[in-house]
Swiss-Prot record:
The gene is arnC. It comes from Yersinia enterocolitica serotype O:8 / biotype 1B (strain NCTC 13174 / 8081). Pathway: Glycolipid biosynthesis; 4-amino-4-deoxy-alpha-L-arabinose undecaprenyl phosphate biosynthesis; 4-amino-4-deoxy-alpha-L-arabinose undecaprenyl phosphate from UDP-4-deoxy-4-formamido-beta-L-arabinose and undecaprenyl phosphate: step 1/2; Bacterial outer membrane biogenesis; lipopolysaccharide biosynthesis. GO terms for biological process: 4-amino-4-deoxy-alpha-L-arabinopyranosyl undecaprenyl phosphate biosynthetic process; lipid A biosynthetic process; lipopolysaccharide biosynthetic process; response to antibiotic. Keywords: Antibiotic resistance, Cell inner membrane, Cell membrane, Glycosyltransferase, Lipid A biosynthesis, Lipid biosynthesis, Lipid metabolism, Lipopolysaccharide biosynthesis, Membrane, Transferase, Transmembrane, Transmembrane helix. Catalyzes the transfer of 4-deoxy-4-formamido-L-arabinose from UDP to undecaprenyl phosphate. The modified arabinose is attached to lipid A and is required for resistance to polymyxin and cationic antimicrobial peptides. It comes from the Bacteria. The lineage of its organism: Bacteria, Pseudomonadati, Pseudomonadota, Gammaproteobacteria, Enterobacterales. Gene3D superfamilies: Spore Coat Polysaccharide Biosynthesis Protein SpsA, Chain A. GO terms for molecular function: phosphotransferase activity, for other substituted phosphate groups; undecaprenyl-phosphate 4-deoxy-4-formamido-L-arabinose transferase activity. Its EC number is 2.4.2.53. This is Undecaprenyl-phosphate 4-deoxy-4-formamido-L-arabinose transferase. GO terms for cellular component: plasma membrane.
Length: 327
């Protein structure tokens, strides 16, 4: 193993949103797992504008004597991936591990991720074994993974699992990307030379419900489409051409049928004509909506507003170390 592959410090980044029930156990289990490491470590918990007592619990944990915890408090809810990027800005380790706060992926897998990363991988992903989710979410996740693999060329089986390890140069490359719509696993793989995956346990959620509502899942789907590729825009031209050709063919067919069967038949085909017309109009609106989604995201990027606003960072000693590293 080369010197450049050795890991000197590990940073754990965990986004938190209304997880007050799971936080005590999360902190306890994550700290216990990190104590098994041979490297120094820090645990950065990012409160993504929680409306419960999550921020207070994180602040108290960060203020404990000899605490390895840094609490990053955002002023409002920005979303999971923006919260993780806020945590990335605070890390001082050369291996960064992301983890969800719901404990569906066990923190006890952290030492194994570190061990695999030491083999020289830039990104270590995970695949959830015996996934404890609904059939709808499993099916949607499988379709998304297939789409991502085709677009990126990176054959990874579970892009939706956020228990992942990244080398520091990968995180720094992601921080230099300023687009607001970000899906971190995909973005990381665009910079990674060597990637791998390991299988991890997946448990049922013990506390609360998933924070991804239907609308958030739809927004995530749009993020995936627009951050992956511009192929849908090219497909619009292809679909438009097919619709135009179909419309022309149908028009010729209707004229021929009218000449053969007479005007009485044409009167009977009005409703068919309207049905086809509505289909074409619907396809146009779908295309306009997709085009508008791209334009809207370009508009957000051009405004160059920050992805998030950090209200407070708690954990004085760790924060000072981070500032020294950044200098």
């Amino acid at each position: 193993m080369s010197e450049s592959e050795k890991i000197k410090k590990v940073s754990i980044v965990i986004p938190v949103y209304n997880e007050q029930e799971s936080l005590p156990i999360l902190i306890e289990r994550t700290s216990a797992a990190c104590k098994l490491l041979t490297q120094p470590y820090e645990i950065i918990l990012v409160d993504d504008g929680s409306s419960d007592n999550s921020a207070e619990l994180l602040t108290a944990a960060a203020n404990e004597p000899e605490s390895h915890i840094i609490a990053v408090l955002l002023n409002r809810n920005y979303g999971q991936h923006s919260a993780i990027m806020a945590g990335f800005n605070q890390v001082s380790g050369d291996l960064i591990i992301t983890l969800d706060a719901d404990l569906q992926n066990p923190p006890e897998e952290i030492p194994r991720l570190v061990s695999v990363a030491e083999e020289g991988y830039d990104v270590v992903g995970t695949v959830r074994a015996h996934r404890q989710d609904s059939l709808f979410r499993k099916t949607a996740s499988r379709m998304i993974n297939m789409m991502i693999q085709r677009a990126t060329g990176k054959s990874m089986g579970d892009y939706g699992c956020m228990l992942r390890a990244y080398r520091r140069h990968i995180v720094e490359a992601m921080l230099h990307c300023h687009e607001r719509s970000t899906f971190i696993p995909i973005l990381a793989n665009t910079f990674a030379r060597r990637t791998t995956e390991i299988t991890v346990h997946h448990a049922e959620r013990e506390f609360g419900d998933s924070k991804y509502s239907l609308m958030k899942l739809i927004n995530l789907m749009y993020d995936l489409i627009t951050c992956l590729t511009t192929t849908p825009l090219r497909l619009l031209s292809l679909v438009g051409s097919v619709i135009a050709l179909s419309g022309f063919t149908l028009a010729v067919l209707l004229v021929v049928l009218r000449l053969v069967f007479g005007p009485e038949w044409a009167g009977g085909g009005v409703f068919t004509l309207f049905a086809v017309l509505f289909m074409f109009i619907g396809a146009q609106f779908v295309g306009m909506g997709l085009l508008g989604e791209y334009i809207g995201r370009i508009y957000n990027d051009v405004r160059a507003r920050p992805r998030y606003f950090i209200q407070k960072v708690v954990g004085a000693e760790q924060t000072e170390n981070n500032q020294e590293v950044e200098k």
